[in-house]
Amino acid sequence: MALGQYILVKLETNRTRSSRLLNRYPKIIGYPIYATDFLFNRMIPKLSITKRVYFFLTKGKSRVLSLSEGLARLFSCGFEVIDYIKIGDETIILSKKIKEPAYDTTPTYGLLVKLDRIGQNGEILKVFKIRTMHPYSEYLQEYLFEQHGTKDGDKIEKDFRVTNWGRFMRKYWIDEIPMVWNWVKRDLKLIGVRPLSEHKFNTYPEYLQKKRVRYKPGLIPPYYADLPHSVEDFFEVEEKYLNAYEKNPIRTDLKYLFKALYNILIKGERSR
């Protein structure tokens, strides 16, 4: 397909499919039908040992995707999403070809993912996490940031890439447990600014970018010590921490560690 051409994609999302099946039949019939459809058209296509057989038999015609994965796959194939609308049981997506496909051989697909993050001296780190988003979600980050911005300088507002079980895991930091391995490898220190994706890093003011890359990122960010409520507050919190760390690293990290633990354990602060 040539650059500049438009394409309309018709998609029945996983939520629409589940609602359609469960509303069509009585519960005693609907739930077994939905479970079978979920297994065959959503899980089997994702498993490496079964997906080839699935696509050979179905050509992918009945495969079920989330809205997030559907949009993200278009971006990964070099398309820009112009707009999308839900009509009945189908979502219609208008897209424009703007570049060549990414040909990504390692998209965020499995349970455990390795994410590229900016580390000390601007080096790229492979950070380990449990996947809490729909597959290919990294391709939607810039699009959603432009559409919704952030709610507190950290997380994207109205981020539909996050799954229901992913929200629970994020709330209690379960998804970040594999990052302990990065700490063991000394890619990260215990307290420090959060390792960022390239896109997120580039949204920071240049002066703060330069300060960030002087030091290793951390497992526990200063966010949980000072609890910012806006983008401006978020930048100020990070700058305040980095300035203090530059003057007295050990005392600063101990201060922020105990303050973060107090907010989490005593005041009940959770990931937002």
Language model features with spans:
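Conserved class I S-adenosyl-L-methionine
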Residues: 3-42
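Low-complexity, charge- and small-residue-enriched intrinsically disordered regions
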Residues: 34-63, 260-272
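A hydrophobic, helix-centered structural microdomain
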Residues: 87-140, 250-272
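Short, glycine-rich, amphipathic interfacial segments at transmembrane boundaries or analogous
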Residues: 115-160, 220-240
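Hydrophobic structural segments characteristic of membrane proteins
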Residues: 119, 178-272
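Short, conserved beta-strand/loop elements in beta-sheet-dominated catalytic cores
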Residues: 161-187
